[in-house]
Amino acid sequence: MSEIPADLYYTSEHEWVLRTGDDTVRVGITDYAQSALGDVVFVQLPDVGADVASGDAFGEVESTKSVSDLYAPVTAKVVAVNGDLEGSPELVNSDPYGEGWLVDLRVEAGTLDEALGGLLDAEGYRAVVTE
């Protein structure tokens, strides 16, 4: 069974979301997703400063098996990207909830609670991956 940390939020597209501040989150892909993808060989991320809309593709993860879109869990501005993935995309496989994070996002002030309320908790995500 894939690791599903209880302190994170999730999307049905297999992204995880960690609240990092009053209006900021860190985003990555889940253990389930990296396992299904196989060995990650390339990660395409947006530029810092880019605006992303909830549910829209913002990048790609390429593995030895396939190329998969990454979807924004919330509408926000990209405030940081994980530059380590350029030279070490395998971090997505080896540490999906840590060193393999993808982007940091900042939402409009005062909207994060509502945005996170639309995401899945660990139990909700577990139901998605066991269907």
UniProtKB/Swiss-Prot annotation:
Belongs to the GcvH family. The glycine cleavage system is composed of four proteins: P, T, L and H. The modification N6-lipoyllysine is found at K65. This is Glycine cleavage system H protein. NCBIfam families: gcvH, PRK01202.1. Its cofactor is (R)-lipoate. The glycine cleavage system catalyzes the degradation of glycine. The H protein shuttles the methylamine group of glycine from the P protein to the T protein. Keywords: Lipoyl. The keyword Lipid metabolism does not apply. It comes from Mycolicibacterium smegmatis (strain ATCC 700084 / mc(2)155). One of its GO terms (biological process) is glycine decarboxylation via glycine cleavage system. The keyword Transcription does not apply. Residues 24-106 form the Lipoyl-binding domain. One of its GO terms (cellular component) is cytosol. Binds 1 lipoyl cofactor covalently.
